[in-house]
């Protein structure tokens, strides 16, 4: 099991760290969503546009009740969509996330978890049952490139993807297309074949690399290695989409 930071328990409920939240439509799960960003991440993705979420103790420490006092204002809207938990990496705060998911299901809300899957072994059966959709970010198909790109191993993510398939949990696959890093046609084809094989990938989102997070790296004094990398061309994006479609997947 992967070691995680300590989360303080308050009675039968968890207390954890919330970085921020926002509303969205369509990209973070079906319908109108409240997107809750949990603090903390063990990956160090070179293209991360939210490095300010890496610190486990950034944001605001809150109880489940305090979080829900904020969420309840959005519930009428969320009936037409749901709530998505992201980060950072939400599974860093696994017990806190589990309590948040349970509270959401008690209010009959659709739930989604946006995760890189590296900590998927922290998802027990009860938590799995409270997740309606997983937005699975697979950063790269080649294990060596994955390690260079994220600082972590690829295999735990693939194991989690297989578990999700066994549990018949729907997945939206997310893939950031970075010229020179994740745009190798062989890697894209390998991931497409894997996604088709597991059989539970409902949608594939090809996300073009951008430089919108560059200023955050500078503010945090971090070494940003992609200063001179340009976004992929429309042709590169279309090519990646067509590769996934060639395996019978719904890609956009």
What are these regions (language model features)?
Residues 1-27, 74, 179-252:
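Auxiliary Fe-S-binding modules of radical SAM enzymes
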């Amino acid at each position: 099991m992967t070691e995680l930071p300590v989360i303080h328990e308050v009675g039968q409920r968890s207390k954890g760290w919330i970085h921020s939240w926002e509303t969205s439509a369509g990209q973070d799960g079906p319908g109108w969503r409240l997107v809750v960003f949990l603090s903390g991440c063990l990956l160090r993705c070179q293209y991360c546009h939210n490095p300010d979420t890496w610190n486990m103790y950034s944001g605001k420490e809150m109880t489940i009740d305090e979080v829900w006092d904020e969420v309840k204002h959005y519930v009428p809207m969320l009936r037409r969509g749901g709530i998505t938990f992201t980060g950072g990496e939400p599974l860093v705060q696994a017990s806190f996330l589990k309590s948040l998911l349970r509270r959401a299901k008690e209010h009959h809300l659709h739930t989604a978890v946006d995760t890189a899957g590296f900590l998927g072994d922290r998802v027990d059966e009860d938590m799995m049952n409270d997740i309606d959709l997983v937005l699975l970010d697979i950063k790269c198909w080649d294990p060596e490139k994955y390690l260079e790109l994220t600082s972590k191993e690829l295999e735990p993510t693939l194991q989690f993807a297989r578990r999700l398939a066994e549990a018949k949990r729907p997945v939206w696959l997310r893939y950031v297309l970075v010229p020179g890093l994740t745009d190798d046609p062989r890697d894209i084809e390998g991931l497409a074949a894997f996604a088709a094989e597991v059989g539970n990938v409902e949608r594939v989102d090809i996300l073009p690399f951008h430089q919108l997070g560059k200023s955050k790296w500078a503010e945090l004094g971090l070494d940003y290695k992609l200063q001179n990398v340009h976004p992929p061309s429309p042709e590169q994006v279309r090519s990646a989409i067509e590769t996934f479609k060639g395996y019978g997947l719904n890609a956009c």
